[in-house]
Amino acid sequence: MPPIFQRLQQATKMSRRKILLLVLGCSTLSLLIHQGAQLSWYPKLFPLSCPPLQDSPPRPKHMTVAFLKTHKTAGTTVQNILFRFAERHNLTVALPHPSCEHQFCYPRNFSAHFVHPATRPPHVLASHLRFDRAELQRLMPPGTVYVTILREPAAMFESLFSYYNQYCPAFRRVPNASLEAFLRAPEAYYRAGEHFAMFAHNTLAYDLGGDNERSPRDDDAYLAGLIRQVEEVFSLVMIAEYFDESLVLLRRLLAWDLDDVLYARLNARAASSRLAAIPAALAQAARAWNALDAGLYDHFNATFWRRVASAGRACVEREARELREARERLLRRCFGDEPVLRPAAQIRTKQLQPWQPSRKVDIMGYDLPSGRAGPATEACLKLAMPEVQYSSYLLRKQKRRGGMRLRPEPVLDNPPPRPIRALRPGH
């Protein structure tokens, strides 16, 4: 073959190779863009920092989870994580019967009868309830992972006092709504057995199914027994003060991806509605009054850090940092370059307006930038959707999936006292 034809043939082969590489490059770029549209904010090409819990093949994601949502512990944010995971994987979420509103007839002991029939049998449970082991195990499938979350009792009590000040009689009796006055002489205002009294004394113990009137000062054995009962059921007790580290342990426990535990902070009070810092003497008094809660928290805070040490503290902290960075990217994409929590009155999107417990407390939320639409916007909406709206949405969706007509619900036999109903924003 003449040299000119050989050079022409080589040039043709090189052109074909370039075209093939160009096609492959475009395909890869298209795939990455598609992943971005699905709100994937973690670089999948890099392994997570922490090694597996043990030398074993990769596990499938765990799909059955019961989360005991305790009060004023960042539980609404955890609930939102679980709701979104359930939606993405077409799982059934246990939701309260309308007679119970958006909680499982709290403060009554939980009963499987409180669950709406359109949401049974469930994969996920995450709404407020008072723990009852037998009833939950009757409802949830075998193999369900049970988790809960605790918060430092002094900070939690300040939040309870602020949030439920208009509903709890013990708090309403206090002159000038003074937390300091209440903690100076709690017995002067507190009445055991009164409606919503559990918000004023050892609320964590009550939520966990314990007797909130017991005191470890009088009966050490009771606290030890309650701790043992919690440890027998719950695979993980998260700690609100170390929320990101808790989510790292949660995703490892459930074999989830980091994307599965990204979040927006929900149900947060405005700075004007909370103490910037609790004085040491006040914190000590709060822990003394809520001694059962303090004992629970101190024990499970210690076991939490043992779990972190077992997983490798450095890698857990590194993964928590990666989680925070991915979360910031997600919030900027969803809510703007400088996402800020804002008062309900400033939120235009009705589905994102958080309910207000009273005129004295401002609960903040997010808003979507105007002019956006599509799957990514829908995902951002769910990320910041308050508990009441998301619960109602999921109930309607699961009714349609089950072929149930959207009609008024019958009232439960022996309905409970009406739970706290928050005022709509602006009311």
Curated annotation (Swiss-Prot):
Gene Ontology terms: biological process: glycolipid biosynthetic process
SUPFAM superfamilies: P-loop containing nucleoside triphosphate hydrolases (SSF52540)
Keyword presence, Mitochondrion: no
GO MF: galactose 3-O-sulfotransferase activity; galactosylceramide sulfotransferase activity
Transmembrane segments: 20-40
Predominant localisation class: Golgi
EC numbers, comma separated: 2.8.2.-
Residues covered by region (Disordered): 404-427
Entry cofactors: Mg(2+)
InterPro entries (alphabetical): Gal-3-0_sulfotransfrase, P-loop_NTPase
Cytoplasmic topological domain residue ranges: 1-19
Protein known as: Galactose-3-O-sulfotransferase 3
Gene name of this polypeptide: GAL3ST3
